[in-house]
């Protein structure tokens, strides 16, 4: 790999780690703090809506955690030179994160800001890693 490629890979791994950390945070919000007064405004839910959707949010939170774990394991794999397996895991994790953000944007345009926050770091990770692995 070229020096430029290695720099792109390093930057991509940083963005993948940020995406993973964000999804761990979302996991905590959805699975444990869903009905909390400070959490509800972030998701645009009333007390009644939050209570009614608590079980769904709990499960969705774990989905986000699993995406974060897949991505984190991929990062570790790349760092210990299991590059092919690590890249596959990172692309699966961040690709799913990005696609989920796109689905959110398309189906709930009023949640555009959340979709952008959710999708930016995975997108940057995917772009940088793709370029880095090519170089």
Where are these regions (language model features)?
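Short, Lys/Arg-enriched N-terminal segments with co-localized hydrophobic residues
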Residues: 1-7
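Juxtamembrane loop-transmembrane helix junctions in multi-pass integral membrane proteins
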Residues: 7-10, 48-51, 55-58, 81-88, ...
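N-terminal signal-anchor transmembrane alpha helix
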Residues: 9-33
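Cytosolic, membrane-interface loops and tails of multi-pass inner-membrane proteins
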Residues: 31-54
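Transmembrane helix-loop junctions in multipass membrane proteins, especially transporters and channels
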Residues: 31-39, 79-83, 109-113, 133-134
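Core segments of transmembrane alpha-helices
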Residues: 60-73, 121-122
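Transmembrane helix-loop-helix
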Residues: 73-120
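Juxtamembrane boundary at the C-terminal end of a transmembrane helix
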Residues: 126-135
């Amino acid at each position: 790999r070229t020096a430029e490629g290695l720099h792109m890979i390093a930057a991509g791994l940083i963005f993948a780690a940020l995406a993973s950390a964000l999804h761990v945070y979302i996991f905590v919000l959805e699975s444990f703090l869903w009905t909390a007064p400070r959490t509800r405004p972030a998701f645009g839910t009333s007390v009644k809506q939050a209570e009614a959707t608590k079980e769904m949010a709990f499960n969705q939170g774990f989905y986000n955690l699993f995406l974060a774990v897949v991505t984190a394991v991929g990062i570790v794999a790349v760092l210990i030179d299991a590059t092919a397996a690590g890249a596959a895991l990172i692309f699966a994790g961040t690709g799913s994160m990005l696609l989920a953000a796109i689905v959110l944007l398309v189906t709930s345009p009023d949640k555009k800001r959340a979709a952008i926050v959710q999708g930016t770091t995975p997108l940057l990770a995917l772009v940088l890693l793709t370029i880095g692995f090519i170089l």
